[in-house]
Design a protein with these regions (language model features):
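Conserved class I S-adenosyl-L-methionine
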Residues: 1-45, 56-60, 83, 90, ...
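Conserved Class I S-adenosyl-L-methionine
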Residues: 3-6, 10, 20-21, 25-28, ...
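A generic alpha-to-beta junction signature in SAM-dependent methyltransferases
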Residues: 39-41, 65, 139
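Class I SAM-dependent methyltransferase SAM/SAH-binding core
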Residues: 46-106, 130
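Conserved hydrophobic residues forming the short capping helix/wall of the S-adenosyl-L-methionine
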Residues: 65, 87-88, 166, 195, ...
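A short acidic, Gly/Pro-enriched loop at the edge of an enzyme's catalytic core
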Residues: 104-115
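Conserved catalytic/acceptor-binding region of the Class I
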Residues: 129-130, 136, 140, 144-216, ...
Length: 278
């Protein structure tokens, strides 16, 4: 899959990521904090965020690095960049700049950033090794590259419970494990191997466990999930209104245990891989 294909797939999702940006920020804040910790973010740093989605972790890191530091917030989709820019303006965050670009062709000089991060973006890079090489190129010597990705589907009911319902109605077909998808790097060691191949040193891998939480109901969860995922939107579009209503009912029932007191709480596991630029 080319960069153009990936961009087109995400372009339609951008409006929904903007719509649900506050919920998404809350859902993944524990992962954002873990990424900040493993990346060694601190005051005064220059940080590059790749595939920022609707503005995170860029806007959180901006607070960590403070006025003496800076964050460059990038995404392959211009609409995502504009959502992040609007959120920064709303929150009066001034130490962030914004740039539309792809991970495998970064428009920055070599040795520009103390830290380069990507939260839940690396799985969708058309050429992960080329992207990792580019990210290392723009990192300063001895600087850190830190990438967060989903662990295995079966460890993440936020995903697999929904998939289980959908697959009862639509044949999922054969999946290419190396094609851009959420669980492309779910196997421990796979992303670390990419980073090593790209030339990183001191490559380390850590499993992060947390709860995906937000003050939303099961029905609101399904509304969000079915909108922000281009894969789900495409599958649901093939079904009749009656079939879609049946899936909604089945998803609500299937996720009930993860909504105590009508509040979302899914256990989750992610993988964070870090490496240094020699």
């Amino acid at each position: 899959m080319t960069s153009e294909n990936v961009v087109e797939a995400w372009r339609e999702s951008a409006q929904y990521w903007a719509k649900h940006s506050d919920t998404i920020r809350k859902m993944f804040m524990p992962l954002t904090r873990a990424l900040v910790e493993h990346a060694g973010n601190h005051e005064g740093q220059a940080v590059l965020d790749i595939a920022e989605g609707a503005g995170e972790p860029s806007l959180t890191i901006a607070d960590v690095v403070g006025p003496g530091g800076s964050v460059t917030c990038t995404d392959a989709v211009q609409e995502m960049v504009e959502t992040a820019r609007s959120e920064a303006q709303r929150r009066d965050i001034t130490n962030v700049r914004f740039q539309q670009c792809t991970a495998d062709s970064l428009p920055f000089p070599s040795d520009s950033f103390d830290v380069v991060v990507s939260r839940l973006g690396a799985m969708f890079f058309p050429d992960p090794v080329a992207a990792a090489c580019e990210m290392l190129r723009v990192t300063k010597p001895n600087g850190c590259l830190a990438l967060a990705v989903w662990h295995k589907s079966e460890l993440n009911p936020f995903c697999h419970v929904v998939t289980g319902v959908i697959d009862r109605h639509i044949n999922p077909g054969a999946a290419d494990p190396d094609a851009p998808n959420a669980f492309r790097f779910a196997e421990p060691g796979k992303l670390a191997g990419v980073m090593t191949e790209a030339g990183a040193s001191d490559v380390k891998e850590q499993v992060v466990k947390f709860n995906i939480e937000a003050p939303i109901s099961a029905l609101e969860f399904w509304s969000m999930r079915s909108q922000i995922s281009d894969t789900l939107r495409d599958k649901l579009a093939k079904l009749s209104a009656g079939e879609q209503a049946q899936i909604t009912s089945e998803v609500e029932q299937a996720v009930q245990e993860f909504f105590p007191a009508n509040q979302m709480r899914f256990p989750a596991q992610m993988i964070i891989v870090t490496g240094k630029k020699p």
